[in-house]
Structures are given as C-alpha cells and as structure tokens.
C-alpha cells in the first residue's frame, strides 16, 4: 500500500514538473519622459523566436504588444526543453515605427537547474553578430548580460527619422540620366543653349535674309584667305 502511494506521488510530481516546464518573459520599454500614447503603442511590437534545440515539431514564434501605457509587455506559457541542465533559447526583436530601440536583438536563455528551479538569463545580441560566440575563436567576445528581474528593459535610442512611404515609380527622363543631369545644372544648360544658337542662327539668317548670309560667308572666306596669305609671306 505504501509503495503504491509513493508511486502515485512520484507520478503526480512528474506530471506537475512536466506541465510546469513553461517559461515567461517580462519586459518593459523605458521611454523616459516620452509618453506611450495609443498611437505609439499600435506601432510598436516585440517578436520572439525560438532558436537552437527545441522539443516541439516547429520552433515557437510569437508577437506581443504593450499591456499598459507604462510600456510593460509579456510572453507567457513558453515551451521549454525538459531535463536537468537543459537550456532553451529565444531571440527577441523590439520594433517600432516611431523610435529606434536598443538593444535591437536580445538573446534569452532558460536553464533547468538541478534543484528543479528555472533560471532566466538575457544578453544583448546586436545585429550583424552570431547568436553565440564561436567556439573556434581563441578569445571569443562575451555577450553583455542584462537585468531580467523584475523585467527586461528595452530603451529608447532616438526617434526614428521620418520615412518616405510614397515613391515615384515612373521617373521622367527630364529628372534622371544625361538629360536630367544637364537640366539640373545651369552651367551645362547654358552651354547647350549656346551651342544650339551657334548652329541654328546662321540657318535662320540665311532663310530670312539670303543677301546678308552671303555677305557673312564672303567675309569669313576673305578673312581666311588673308590669314593664309600672311602665313605664306613669312
């Protein structure tokens, strides 16, 4: 009878421990003097991705937003790997259309300790770097740890620049390319106009006043002959 009670108690403890293997991540966006209005809250989100080894068929993903106007947010009921000293890793991405936030990527670690408790760690994990320091490097760069209690703090770097969401897809030839380059420079445009005038003006004069045009050509030929004669006399 006693052995059956012990067996049932062990089974109950196992079930409780198995079902208790769920994690929670609490965070807060600290905007300092800036207020989190309803407009800002709808344009700010936090995405979570499970990486590394995972016990489920597919890695866990989730997106959450603010719980209140103080900037609190939470990921609850996260699946964790079973076993002593087993670790589960998540990566969190803060994103906002109004602010640039830091850190822009956070590595979160859940570790099952031998005493049955769950240890939560967080590290700043910037874009352009690996999730974990490479083991092949003699002196790998250590990730900077973050405070996780009572929450993980995400801070404001600065306001995001105004984004242009409307772009002209059919750009005119007068604003790009060789033609656009000439039209956008007053000196180049003046040179082109002068060249056109030198070519077109004699044609216009000949059409309007043939006698004057003939006189101009004769004068040009006379000056050319005088030039050659002066060179030959030397």
From Swiss-Prot:
Can the keyword Transmembrane be found in this entry's annotation? yes
Membrane side Cytoplasmic: residue ranges: 210-234
Name any Gene Ontology BP term: protein transport
UniProt entry tagged with the keyword Glycoprotein: yes
Q: Which UniProt keywords apply?
A: Endoplasmic reticulum, Glycoprotein, Membrane, Protein transport, Signal, Transmembrane, Transmembrane helix, Transport
- Mainly resides where? endoplasmic reticulum
User: Out of the domains of life, which is the source?
Assistant: Eukaryota
Tell where it localizes. Answer: Endoplasmic reticulum membrane
How does this chain sit within the bilayer? Single-pass type I membrane protein
Record-annotated membrane-spanning stretches: 189-209
> What are its GO cellular component terms?
endoplasmic reticulum membrane
Give me the glycosylation sites of this protein.
35, 53, 85, 115, 170
Signal sequence, renumbered to the chain: 1-18
State the function annotated in the UniProt record: Involved in the export of PMA1, possibly through the monitoring or assisting of PMA1 folding and acquisition of competence to enter vesicles.
| Family assignment from sequence similarity | Belongs to the SOP4 family.
- Protein's name according to its UniProt entry: Protein SOP4
Natural source organism: Saccharomyces cerevisiae (strain YJM789) (Baker's yeast)
Q: What is the lineage of its organism?
A: Eukaryota, Fungi, Dikarya, Ascomycota, Saccharomycotina
């Amino acid at each position: 009878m006693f052995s059956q009670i012990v067996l049932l108690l062990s089974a109950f403890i196992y079930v409780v421990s198995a079902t208790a293997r769920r994690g929670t991540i609490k965070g807060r966006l600290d905007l300092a003097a800036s207020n989190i209005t309803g407009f800002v809250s709808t344009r700010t989100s936090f995405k979570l991705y499970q990486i590394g080894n995972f016990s489920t068929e597919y890695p866990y993903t989730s997106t959450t937003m603010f719980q209140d106007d103080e900037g609190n947010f939470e990921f609850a009921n996260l699946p964790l790997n079973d076993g002593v000293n087993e670790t589960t890793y998540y990566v969190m991405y803060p994103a906002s259309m109004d602010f640039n936030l830091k850190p822009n990527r956070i590595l979160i670690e859940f570790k099952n300790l031998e005493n049955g408790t769950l240890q939560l760690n967080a590290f700043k994990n910037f874009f352009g770097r690996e999730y974990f320091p490479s083991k092949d490097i003699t002196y790998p760069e250590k990730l900077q740890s973050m405070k996780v209690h009572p929450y993980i703090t995400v801070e404001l770097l600065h306001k995001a620049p105004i984004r242009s969401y409307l772009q002209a897809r059919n750009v005119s030839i007068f604003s790009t390319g060789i033609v656009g380059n000439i039209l956008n420079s007053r000196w180049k445009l003046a040179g082109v106009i002068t060249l056109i005038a030198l070519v077109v003006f004699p044609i216009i004069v000949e059409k309007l006043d043939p006698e004057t045009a003939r006189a101009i050509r004769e004068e040009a030929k006379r000056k050319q002959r005088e030039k050659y004669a002066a060179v030959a006399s030397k």
